[in-house]
Amino acid sequence: MKVLALNSSPRSAGESKTELMLNHLVKGMREAGADVEIVHLRKKKINHCIGCFTCWTKTPGLCLHKDDMTNELYPKWRESDLVIYASPLYHFTVNAEMKAFIERTLPSIQPFFEDCKDHTTHPLRFKHPSIVLLSVAGFPE
């Protein structure tokens, strides 16, 4: 199984509880035979989605931004069987780095809607990887 583990914590090793928890998860996955690559989003240049929909109209499936997301991360995401989104909990959700990554996967869906039983959705351009969310809150409760 090919796994891409995305760590969106802005903190480095030793300070990041997200990274600590992710490392334990990855260790177990590797012991079980998974091929896991960890990517620290804080070290990557990911421009924000600007909602231009070029990836749907002018260049279907391709974002107009030329950055680490387009050139490296999106292809790895597409080729993975499983992707781990590891993020600290900031203001009730994933942090801005992870949100930017997720928004930049917009080229992976098509611009029209289709009915799927009890809901309406955008059809996928290709089979998406399975997603696991590892959300970490550093406050003791």
Give the predicted meaning of each segment.
Residues M1-Q110:
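N-terminal beta1-alpha1-beta2 submodule of the flavodoxin-like/Rossmannoid cofactor-binding fold
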Residues Q110-E141:
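Short, glycine-/small-residue-rich phosphate/pyrophosphate-handling segment
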